[in-house]
Curated annotation (Swiss-Prot):
Signal peptide (UniProt feature, chain positions): 1-24
Disulfide bonds: 404-1059
PROSITE patterns referenced in this protein's UniProt entry, alphabetically: VWFA
Transmembrane segments: 1074-1094
Further information: Binds gabapentin, an antiepileptic drug.
Name the UniProt record assigns to this protein: Voltage-dependent calcium channel subunit alpha-2/delta-1
Functional note: The alpha-2/delta subunit of voltage-dependent calcium channels regulates calcium current density and activation/inactivation kinetics of the calcium channel. Plays an important role in excitation-contraction coupling.
C-alpha cells in the first residue's frame, strides 16, 4: 500500500514538472513537451505542404475539368459483369473438355488391344527426350517425333502446334504393352486438340491424364526447358497432380490404420512410414483423413482425434507423427478396426461425407476380424484397402480377404520401388461408381489454384473423367466395364481471369477477389506464392520475395480468404455467404495491411459479392469510399495529346522532372517492361507512330496517363521549378492513379527506388487511407545503416470534391534531409537556460533519449548519433523495454499475421543419396563388414539394385549431381509470422514510469497532430537496465498457429454437391493379388552371389 502511494506521488510530481530522474533538474512538464511537439509539427507540416504543392495540384485538377469526366464505379454492376465474363470463359473451356472426353471414350472403345507392335509402329513425341541426350532414339515398337519448336508468348516457352507431347513417369517402362496400346489409341486425340484450338485460339494446355500414368498434352513442348533448369530430376506423375486427383474420384473420408506391433520393426516399419506419407499425397483439400496406429490397443498417431481436412498443414502433422511411431507388442486387428470404424462413422465433425475408406498397412497376420466387419460394415459402405508391407512369410490370405469382402483392394509393397505405384492405384477402385453412374458423373469440376508444371504460373483446371465404355450397349443398361480410363483437363491461367476483372479504375486500394467452396482464394492481391519447385514457373512477385526453386512445390496453393486479409467477424460472415453462393454487400471499417507488410491502417471498405454461375466459385469487389468515382480523361484533340506526351520524353526530364510510367498493357503491340527507360522510349515511339486512339490500344488507359502527365508537368513548371531551393528538402514527387511518377529535380529521380507501378506503391496506398501527412521510414532491414541518407519520405493524398463527388487522383510529397531535420529537432527541444542534464533533448545526452517514431513503431529521428544510424529500424530492436511499455499503455496495438506462402532455408542440409527418401544408403564401412549383409538393410539394397537392373529407368529419377541436389533444395516452403504495430486510439498524450524492478525510467509521449508521428522523451536506457529481449517486427520463420487447436474449430466449407461412392452394379471381385514387382528367386540368388564376390574379392575397388 505504501509503495503504491509513493508511486502515485512520484507520478504526480513528475507531471507537475517538479522532479526528474536525477533529482537535479525537473523533468520537462507535459505542457513544455507539448509546446515543443506543436512547434515540430507546425514546421514539418508547413514544410511538406509548401514544398509538395498538394494544394496547387488540386487546383490544377479543378481548373481543367473540361478535360475529364467523373464516372461512377457501380460495384454491383461491375462485379456481376465480371462474374458473367468469367462464367463465359470457363463455359467455353468446358465445351472443349466435353469434346475431348467424348472422343477419348469413342476412340478407346473402338481400339483393338494388341500384344505386339511392329518396329517403330507407334509414333509419338516423348516430352522428356531432351532430358537425356544419350537415351535411345525409341523403345521397341515406337518411333520418336522431333517437333520444330517456336517461342510462344502465350505459354512463355517453346511449343509446337503441330504435335502433342507425351509424358511417361520415370518408373513406368515406355516399351510395355500397356503403354504402347495407350500411345496408339490416344494419338487420335491430337486432332481434337487441334480442332479445339481452331475454335478457341486462347486455349492453353489440353491434357489427358491416363490411369496408367501416361499424360498426353497439347501443344507439344519439352518437359523441362534445359536453358532454365538444366539436369533436374523428373518425379512428375500425372496421377498425383491436384486436378487428376479431384477428377478421378469423389471426395474421400479416409482412416489410415497402421500396424505397429513388434513384427513390423526395422525395414518394414520404414517402408510403412514412407507408404503412409505417399498415401497422404494422394489426398486433396476436398478430402478428410486421420492416421491411427494399433497393436494390442489402438490410438491416434497425432493430436488429431477425428478426421481432419487433408490440407498441407494437417498432412504435415500426420507425416511427422507417423515418422515417430515405434513398433512393439502384438497385433490385434479387432482393436484396430473397431477404432477405425468408430472414428470413420463419427458424423459430428466436419468431413467429406462421401467415399469412406480404411487403409490398412501391416506385415500380415492370421486374424480376419470378421465380427468387426459384420458389426460395422454389413452394407459394405466402407471400403477396406489392405497393404502387405515388407518381405515376410505370413499368409496373405487374411488381409486379402479383408479387402475383397469390403469392396476394396489388396496390394503388396515388398520394397521401396513399389510404394508410389501401389499407394495411388486405389483411385481406380474409387472410380468404379463414377463409371457406372455414366452421364450423371460427367460433370465438369474446377480445381483449387495450383502452380502449373508447364510454366503457366497459377492456374485452375477444368476436369472431366473419361470412362471405359467398351462392351456398353447403346441404351447403357449392359454395363460390362467399370474402369476409369483417366481424366481430361483444360487449364485456365489466373492471368486470363484477371483480365476480366479490370483494376485501373478502382484506385490502388480497390480490388477483386474470388474464392472456392473451401474458402481458398483464386484471385486476390495477396495471393503470391513463391515458385520453389524444379520446373515451376517464375511469376511476378513482390521484390522482397526470393525467387528460388525446390521440388517440394507440387502442393496446391491454398490461401484462405481469412488468411489473405486481416480477419474480423464481418469477413467471416462474408466468406460463409460467398461459399453458400449468395449475393450481398457490406460496408464496414477494417484493418488493412500495407503493401510492404510493415504497417496497418484503418479504412472503410465496401464488399460486394456474387456467385459465378456454372461453377462453385464466388467473386467479390472491394472498394474504399474514395473509389466510388474515378476520372475518365477525354483528350479528344490530338494536339493536346501530343503536347502532354511530349512531357514524357527523357529529353525533358531536366525541366519536367525524372518521369516513370506504370508498366501496364496500354496496347497489344506494346509489351510492358521492368526497364522504365526502355519502356518509356517504346511508349513514346508507339504513341507518336500510331496515336493513342489506335484500335489496338486501351484508349482510356492511354488518355488517363497523358492527362496525368500534363497535369503533373504543370505542377513542376508552374510551382516546383519557381520555388527557390528549400532547406531540408532533397526531392519532391507526385504519383498518380493514371500511372505517372515525377521526381524533381532530375538527379533525385535517378536514385528513385519506388515501384513505377503506382498501384503497387506501399506509401501511395497508405496515403490514400490517411488524411494526415504520412512519414515513411526507410527500409533498415533491407538497406541497413545509412538508408536514411536518401531522405525520409513525406506524402499526402490530393483530395478533390468534383460536383460533390470525392476523388483522390494523386499523392504528392517530399523527401526530407535527415541532417536538417535533426538540426531543427534539436533546436526545438532545447531549453535555455537549462543547467541540468534532463531538462531537454540535448544532442547525445547521456541521460535522456528523445526519439520520433512513426505509427508502425519505426525510428525516424533521435537526439543520439548512434540512433541516427538506425533510422528506419523497428524501435523494439533498439529499446525493447520501452516499446513493450508503449504497447502496455495502449499507445500501440499490434496484429500478428502469418504468411503461408513463404520460402525459407532448410533447417538442416539433407544427405545426398541415390535412393528414395526412405531408402537406406550404406556406408563403405557397412559394405566391407560381411556381417552387415545379414541385416534387413542389406536386403533393402538388394531389392533396389535388382529393381534398377530389371527396370533400369525406375530409379533414374533419383540420380543427381551434388550441386544440382544442393541447389534444388536450397529453399523450402514454410510459414513465417510478422507483427505489425499501429496506433490503438486517438489519445494524444501519455506519461508515466517504466518500472524495471530495481529502477525506473520517467517518460512522456506526445503525438504530432496531422501526421503519423509520435514524440517520446524518456530517461536513457543506459541509466536503468531493463528487459533487453528484442521485440521483433520483421518476418520470422514460424510453426504457425497450432494445427491441433485449429481443427477443433474448422472454418466453414462446402464439399461437392454430388457423390459417387457406391453402385449396386459394381463388380468388386477384382480385389488384388501379387505385386508385379516381385523379383524371381533365381535373380535374387544371382545378384547376391555377384555382390558377395565384389565384397570379398574387390575391396580395393570399393575403396
Amino acid at each position: 500500500m505504501a509503495a503504491g502511494c509513493l508511486l502515485a506521488l512520484t507520478l504526480t510530481l513528475f507531471q507537475s514538472g517538479l522532479i526528474g530522474p536525477s533529482s537535479e533538474e525537473p523533468f520537462p512538464s507535459p505542457v513544455t513537451i507539448k509546446s515543443w511537439v506543436d512547434k515540430m509539427q507546425e514546421d514539418l507540416v508547413t514544410l511538406a505542404k509548401t514544398a509538395s504543392g498538394v494544394t496547387q495540384l488540386a487546383d490544377i485538377y479543378e481548373k481543367y475539368q473540361d478535360l475529364y469526366t467523373v464516372e461512377p464505379n457501380n460495384a454491383r454492376q461491375l462485379v456481376e459483369i465480371a462474374a458473367r465474363d468469367i462464367e463465359k470463359l470457363l463455359s467455353n473451356r468446358s465445351k472443349a473438355l466435353v469434346r475431348l472426353a467424348m472422343e477419348a471414350e469413342k476412340v478407346q472403345a473402338a481400339h483393338q488391344w494388341r500384344e505386339d507392335f511392329a518396329s517403330n509402329e507407334v509414333v509419338y513425341y516423348n516430352a522428356k527426350d531432351d532430358l537425356d541426350p544419350e537415351r535411345n532414339e525409341s523403345e521397341p515398337g515406337s518411333q520418336r517425333i522431333k517437333p520444330v519448336f517456336i517461342e510462344d508468348a502465350n505459354f512463355g516457352r517453346q511449343i509446337s502446334y503441330q504435335h502433342a507431347a507425351v509424358h511417361i513417369p520415370t518408373d513406368i517402362y515406355e516399351g510395355s504393352t500397356i503403354v504402347l496400346n495407350e500411345l496408339n489409341w490416344t494419338s487420335a486425340l491430337d486432332e481434337v486438340f487441334k480442332r479445339n484450338r481452331d475454335e478457341d485460339p486462347t486455349l492453353l494446355w489440353q491434357v489427358f491424364g491416363s490411369a496408367t500414368g501416361l499424360a498426353r498434352y497439347y501443344p507439344a513442348s519439352p518437359w523441362v526447358d534445359n536453358s532454365r533448369t538444366p539436369n533436374k530430376i523428373d518425379l512428375y506423375d500425372v496421377r498425383r497432380r491436384p486436378w487428376y486427383i479431384q477428377g478421378a474420384a469423389s471426395p474421400k473420408d479416409m482412416l489410415i490404420l497402421v500396424d505397429v506391433s513388434g513384427s513390423v520393426s526395422g525395414l518394414t516399419l520404414k517402408l510403412i512410414r514412407t507408404s503412409v506419407s505417399e498415401m497422404l499425397e494422394t489426398l486433396s483439400d476436398d478430402d478428410f483423413v486421420n492416421v491411427a496406429s494399433f497393436n494390442s490397443n489402438a490410438q491416434d498417431v497425432s493430436c488429431f482425434q477425428h478426421l481432419v481436412q487433408a490440407n498441407v498443414r494437417n498432412k504435415k502433422v500426420l507425416k511427422d507423427a507417423v515418422n515417430n511411431i515405434t513398433a512393439k507388442g502384438i497385433t490385434d486387428y479387432k482393436k484396430g478396426f473397431s477404432f477405425a470404424f468408430e472414428q470413420l462413422l463419427n458424423y459430428n465433425v466436419s468431413r467429406a461425407n462421401c467415399n469412406k475408406i480404411i487403409m490398412l498397412f501391416t506385415d500380415g497376420g492370421e486374424e480376419r476380424a470378421q465380427e468387426i466387419f459384420a458389426k460395422y460394415n454389413k452394407d459394405k459402405k466402407v471400403r477396406v484397402f489392405t497393404f502387405s508391407v515388407g518381405q515376410h512369410n505370413y499368409d496373405r490370405g487374411p488381409i486379402q480377404w479383408m479387402a475383397c469382402e469390403n469392396k476394396g483392394y489388396y496390394y503388396e509393397i515388398p520394397s521401396i520401388g513399389a510404394i508410389r505405384i501401389n499407394t495411388q492405384e486405389y483411385l481406380d477402385v474409387l472410380g468404379r461408381p463414377m463409371v457406372l453412374a455414366g452421364d450423371k458423373a460427367k460433370q465438369v469440376q474446377w480445381t483449387n489454384v495450383y502452380l502449373d508444371a508447364l510454366e503457366l504460373g497459377l492456374v485452375i483446371t477444368g476436369t472431366l473423367p473419361v470412362f471405359n465404355v467398351t462392351g456398353q450397349s447403346e441404351n447403357k443398361t449392359n454395363l460390362k466395364n467399370q474402369l476409369i480410363l483417366g481424366v481430361m483437363g483444360v487449364d485456365v491461367s489466373l492471368e486470363d481471369i484477371k483480365r476480366l476483372t479490370p483494376r485501373f479504375t478502382l484506385c490502388p486500394n480497390g480490388y477483386y477477389f474470388a474464392i472456392d467452396p473451401n474458402g481458398y482464394v483464386l484471385l486476390h492481391p495477396n495471393l503470391q506464392p513463391k515458385p520453389i519447385g524444379v520446373g515451376i514457373p517464375t511469376i511476378n512477385l513482390r521484390k522482397r520475395r526470393p525467387n528460388v526453386q525446390n521440388p517440394k512445390s507440387q502442393e496446391p496453393v491454398t490461401l484462405d480468404f481469412l488468411d489473405a486479409e486481416l480477419e474480423n467477424e464481418i469477413k467471416v460472415e462474408i466468406r460463409n455467404k460467398m461459399i453458400d453462393g449468395e449475393s450481398g454487400e457490406k460496408t464496414f471499417r477494417t484493418l488493412v495491411k500495407s503493401q510492404d507488410e510493415r504497417y496497418i491502417d484503418k479504412g472503410n471498405r465496401t464488399y460486394t459479392w456474387t456467385p459465378v454461375n456454372g461453377t462453385d466459385y464466388s467473386l467479390a469487389l472491394v472498394l474504399p469510399t474514395y473509389s466510388f468515382y474515378y476520372i475518365k480523361a477525354k483528350l479528344e484533340e490530338t494536339i493536346t495529346q501530343a503536347r502532354y506526351s511530349e512531357t514524357l520524353k527523357p529529353d525533358n526530364f531536366e525541366e519536367s522532372g525524372y518521369t516513370f510510367i506504370a508498366p501496364r498493357e496500354y496496347c497489344n503491340d506494346l509489351k510492358p517492361s521492368d526497364n522504365n527507360t526502355e519502356f518509356l522510349l517504346n511508349f513514346n515511339e508507339f504513341i507518336d507512330r500510331k496515336t493513342p486512339n489506335n484500335p489496338s490500344c486501351n484508349t482510356d488507359l492511354i488518355n488517363r496517363i497523358l492527362l496525368d502527365a500534363g497535369f503533373t508537368n504543370e505542377l513542376v513548371q508552374n510551382y516546383w521549378s519557381k520555388q527557390k531551393n528549400i532547406k531540408g528538402v532533397k526531392a519532391r514527387f507526385v504519383v498518380t492513379d493514371g500511372g505517372i511518377t515525377r521526381v524533381y529535380p532530375k538527379e533525385a529521380g535517378e536514385n528513385w527506388q519506388e515501384n513505377p507501378e503506382t498501384y503497387e506503391d506501399s506509401f501511395y496506398k497508405r496515403s490514400l487511407d490517411n488524411d494526415n501527412y504520412v512519414f515513411t521510414a526507410p527500409y533498415f532491414n533491407k538497406s541497413g545503416p545509412g538508408a536514411y541518407e536518401s531522405g525520409i519520405m513525406v506524402s499526402k493524398a490530393v483530395e478533390l470534391y468534383i460536383q460533390g463527388k470525392l476523388l483522390k487522383p494523386a499523392v504528392v510529397g517530399i523527401k526530407i534531409d535527415v541532417n536538417s531535420w535533426i538540426e531543427n529537432f534539436t533546436k526545438t527541444s532545447i531549453r535555455d537556460p537549462c543547467a541540468g542534464p534532463v531538462c531537454d533533448c540535448k544532442r547525445n545526452s547521456d541521460v535522456m533519449d528523445c526519439v520520433i517514431l512513426d505509427d508502425g513503431g519505426f525510428l525516424l529521428m533521435a537526439n543520439h548519433d548512434d540512433y541516427t544510424n538506425q533510422i528506419g529500424r523497428f524501435f523494439g530492436e533498439i529499446d525493447p523495454s520501452m516499446m513493450r511499455h508503449l504497447v502496455n499503455i495502449s499507445l500501440y496495438a499490434f496484429n500478428k499475421s502469418y504468411d503461408y506462402q513463404s520460402v525459407c532455408d532448410p533447417g538442416a542440409a539433407p544427405k545426398q543419396g541415390a535412393g528414395h527418401r526412405s531408402a537406406y544408403v550404406p556406408s563403405i564401412a557397412d559394405i566391407l563388414q560381411i556381417g552387415w549383409w545379414a541385416t534387413a538393410a542389406a536386403w533393402s539394397i538388394l531389392q533396389q539394385l535388382l529393381l534398377s537392373l530389371t527396370f533400369p529407368r525406375l530409379l533414374e529419377a533419383v540420380e543427381m549431381e551434388e550441386d544440382d541436389f544442393t541447389a534444388s533444395l536450397s529453399k523450402q516452403s514454410c510459414i513465417t509470422e510478422q507483427t505489425q504495430y499501429f496506433f490503438k486510439n486517438d489519445t494524444k498524450s501519455f506519461s508515466g514510469l517504466l518500472d524495471c524492478g530495481n529502477c525506473s525510467r520517467i517518460f512522456h509521449v506526445e503525438k504530432l497532430m496531422n501526421t503519423n508521428l509520435v514524440f517520446i522523451m524518456v530517461e536513457s536506457k543506459g541509466t536503468c537496465p531493463c528487459d533487453t529481449r528484442l521485440l521483433m517486427q520483421a518476418e520470422q520463420t514460424s510453426d504457425g498457429p497450432d494445427p491441433c487447436d485449429m481443427v477443433k474449430q474448422p472454418r466453414y466449407r462446402k464439399g461437392p454437391d454430388v457423390c459417387f461412392d457406391n453402385n449396386v452394379l459394381e463388380d468388386y471381385t477384382d480385389c488384388g493379388g501379387v505385386s508385379g514387382l516381385n523379383p524371381s528367386l533365381w535373380s535374387i540368388f544371382g545378384l547376391q552371389f555377384i555382390l558377395l564376390w565384389l565384397v570379398s574379392g574387390s575391396r580395393h575397388y570399393l575403396l
